């Protein structure tokens, strides 16, 4: 055995005890509100098409699958949970393992714990208030600041993300030391996202959580487009102390529109020489059957616990980080 091998957990036993207490409190939060806890598969025959997500892939070989069946570890339980909603589950939540074949570091681990929940008949604002309630309970923090994506951009970059052109975006990127990257990027939306990541995120949610809502419609993902302003989507994200904690939507219910978005993602993947991903036909069938009007959110539990315990890094609050797995 290598002398550098460490069998010990990355988190202290004291932190693991505190972690267990926080997870128990999260469960109470939802059971007290009549939200059903569910479990869904960790693997699927389909996966996300989002160009910024990298799923793990494996092969299932068993009876009737002599040549093997490609399976994907879930980056989120979203698709399966929406199928439950379409089947009439009512409000549901899940605490589960999710997997993303991406970086490992202070705020990232390729295997992580996700809290995801869905509220039929909630709009985006009502769900944001419930997320705020949960954060105040777990983090003992102040009520969050609420600002639109447009307001955040104007405040910190003095640019309107809904109307700014690519030349102005590249000029702003140059001021942030990102000129070399920006000059090679021709997609306007990617430039907007880059400026938000490096020019806005570091400045919000420092003293209390910040909810940023009404993302550009080009970043709608699985969210509805706002009926009041078609330039924006009913999507929000939550930030606190430099960490992205949660991502929520008023959920898209139109199966045809969702298929178009998946296909558009795959076209973007092809343009970037990324593998095109299999579209989840089961999800689309559920949407066609009828997904109730609802809002949903995914929250990173390890990051939440890291903040609650004032830990320096994720490995301080998970039993075994990927380096010790």
From Swiss-Prot:
ATP binds at residues 100-102, 109, 244-245, 300. Substrate binds at residues 76-78, 118, 251. PANTHER family: ELONGATION FACTOR P--(R)-BETA-LYSINE LIGASE, LYSYL-TRNA SYNTHETASE. It comes from the Bacteria. Homodimer. Keywords: ATP-binding, Ligase, Nucleotide-binding. Belongs to the class-II aminoacyl-tRNA synthetase family. EpmA subfamily. With EpmB is involved in the beta-lysylation step of the post-translational modification of translation elongation factor P (EF-P). Catalyzes the ATP-dependent activation of (R)-beta-lysine produced by EpmB, forming a lysyl-adenylate, from which the beta-lysyl moiety is then transferred to the epsilon-amino group of a conserved specific lysine residue in EF-P. One of its GO terms (cellular component) is cytosol. It is an enzyme of class 6 (ligase). One of its GO terms (biological process) is lysyl-tRNA aminoacylation. It catalyses: D-beta-lysine + L-lysyl-[protein] + ATP = N(6)-((3R)-3,6-diaminohexanoyl)-L-lysyl-[protein] + AMP + diphosphate + H(+). The gene is epmA. This is Elongation factor P--(R)-beta-lysine ligase. It comes from Pectobacterium carotovorum subsp. carotovorum (strain PC1). InterPro entries: Aa-tRNA-synt_II, aa-tRNA-synth_II, aa-tRNA-synth_II/BPL/LPL, EpmA, Lys-tRNA-synth_II_C. GO terms for molecular function: acid-ammonia (or amide) ligase activity; ATP binding; lysine-tRNA ligase activity; tRNA binding. Its EC number is 6.3.2.-. It holds the Pfam family tRNA-synt_2.
């Amino acid at each position: 055995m290598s002398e550098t091998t460490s069998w010990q957990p990355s988190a202290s036993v004291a932190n693991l005890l505190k972690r267990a207490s926080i997870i128990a409190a999260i469960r109470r939060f939802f059971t007290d509100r009549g939200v059903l806890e569910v479990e869904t598969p960790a693997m699927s025959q389909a996966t996300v098409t989002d160009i910024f997500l990298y799923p793990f892939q494996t092969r299932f070989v068993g009876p009737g699958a002599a040549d093997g069946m490609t399976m994907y570890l879930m980056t989120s339980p979203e698709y399966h949970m929406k199928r439950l909603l379409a089947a009439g589950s009512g409000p549901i939540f899940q605490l589960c393992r999710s997997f993303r074949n991406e970086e490992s570091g202070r705020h990232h681990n390729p295997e992580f714990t996700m809290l995801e929940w869905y509220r039929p008949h909630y709009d985006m604002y009502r769900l944001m208030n419930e997320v705020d309630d949960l954060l105040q309970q777990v983090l003992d923090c102040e009520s969050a600041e609420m600002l639109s994506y447009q307001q955040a951009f104007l405040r910190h970059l003095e640019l309107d993300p809904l109307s700014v052109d690519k030349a102005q975006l590249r000029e702003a990127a140059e001021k942030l030391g990102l000129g070399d990257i920006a000059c090679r990027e021709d997609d306007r939306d990617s430039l907007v996202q880059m400026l938000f990541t490096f020019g806005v995120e570091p400045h919000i949610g420092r003293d209390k959580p910040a909810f940023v809502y009404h993302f550009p419609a080009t970043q709608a993902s699985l969210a509805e487009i706002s009926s009041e302003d078609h330039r924006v989507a009913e999507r929000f994200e939550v930030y606190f102390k430099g960490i992205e904690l949660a991502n929520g939507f008023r959920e898209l219910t139109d199966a045809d529109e969702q298929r178009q978005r998946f296909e558009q993602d795959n076209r973007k993947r092809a343009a970037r020489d990324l593998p095109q991903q299999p579209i989840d036909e089961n999800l689309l069938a559920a949407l066609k059957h009828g997904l109730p009007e609802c809002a949903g959110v995914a929250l990173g539990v390890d990051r939440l616990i890291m903040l609650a315990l004032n830990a320096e890094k994720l490995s301080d609050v998970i039993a075994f980080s990927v380096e010790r797995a």
